[in-house]
């Protein structure tokens, strides 16, 4: 299994240490073991390679943008099973990651993973986003929902000059969503991701 992870990371030119491979391997195995109990991911994707490619690698496609902007802290909203927050934290260990998840089941899983993977740069926040009072330079979200559903509330959690990085799919759908929220932000940028996964993946950067 570790060889599969190494191949996938190398194919996308990600830099990694052997300990990163070990953590990803353990993380995926824990998801497979506990998915039914914690309702972490879709059952149709509940095999090792699907989790590796559709979730782990996809999450890592945003890492270069985080490093380019270089915030001191990152808030990951609706972390679920930990994508992208846990993955980014593994490969970006010098930065603090806050993972906000309202579901008690999923936040319990995240707390278990944080301890087992020894992720000292991760803090789990278990409550509704409306209760968050802190302001952040950088917010990530990886959700299938329309950006119009969460753009305003996330904007209100941004520091001046901060940005939201949303993982999104097809470009034509993104254009429709961007038109609904373009007046909320000073700048909106769409970055096409160089994915080998044969799926259309983009990042939408929403600047306050």
Curated annotation (Swiss-Prot):
Gene3D superfamilies cross-referenced by the UniProt entry: Vaccinia Virus protein VP39
Sorted UniProt keywords: Cytoplasm, Methyltransferase, rRNA processing, S-adenosyl-L-methionine, Transferase
GO molecular function (one): rRNA (guanine-N7-)-methyltransferase activity
Source organism superkingdom: Bacteria
EC id: 2.1.1.-
Main subcellular localisation: cytoplasm
Amino-acid positions noted as binding S-adenosyl-L-methionine in the UniProt annotation, renumbered to this chain: 78, 83, 101-103, 129-130, 142
GO cellular component labels: cytosol
Pfam families according to UniProt: GidB
InterPro entries named among the record's database cross-references: rRNA_ssu_MeTfrase_G, SAM-dependent_MTases_sf
PANTHER family: S-ADENOSYL-L-METHIONINE-DEPENDENT METHYLTRANSFERASES SUPERFAMILY PROTEIN
Family: Belongs to the methyltransferase superfamily. RNA methyltransferase RsmG family.
Function field: Specifically methylates the N7 position of a guanine in 16S rRNA.
Protein name: Ribosomal RNA small subunit methyltransferase G
Organism: Borreliella burgdorferi (strain ATCC 35210 / DSM 4680 / CIP 102532 / B31) (Borrelia burgdorferi)
Organism ancestry: Bacteria, Pseudomonadati, Spirochaetota, Spirochaetia, Spirochaetales
């Amino acid at each position: 299994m570790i060889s599969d992870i190494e191949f996938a990371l190398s194919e996308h030119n990600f830099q990694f240490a052997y300990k990163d491979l070990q953590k990803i391997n353990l993380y995926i195995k824990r998801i497979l073991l506990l998915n039914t109990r914690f309702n972490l991911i879709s059952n149709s994707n509940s095999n090792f390679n699907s989790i590796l490619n559709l979730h782990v690698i996809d999450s890592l496609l945003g890492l270069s943008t985080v490093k380019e902007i270089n915030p001191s802290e990152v808030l990951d909203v609706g972390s679920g099973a930990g994508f992208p927050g846990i993955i980014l934290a593994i490969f970006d260990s010098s930065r603090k990651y806050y993972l906000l998840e309202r579901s008690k089941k999923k936040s319990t899983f995240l707390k278990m993973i944080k301890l087992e993977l020894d992720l000292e740069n991760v803090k789990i926040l278990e409550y509704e986003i409306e209760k968050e009072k802190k302001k952040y330079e950088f917010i990530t979200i990886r959700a299938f929902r329309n950006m119009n559903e969460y753009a305003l509330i996330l904007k209100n959690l941004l520091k001046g000059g901060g940005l939201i990085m949303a993982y999104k799919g097809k470009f034509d759908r993104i254009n429709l969503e961007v038109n609904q929220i373009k007046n909320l932000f000073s700048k909106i940028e769409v970055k096409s991701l160089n994915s080998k996964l044969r799926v259309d993946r983009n990042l939408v950067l929403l600047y306050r």
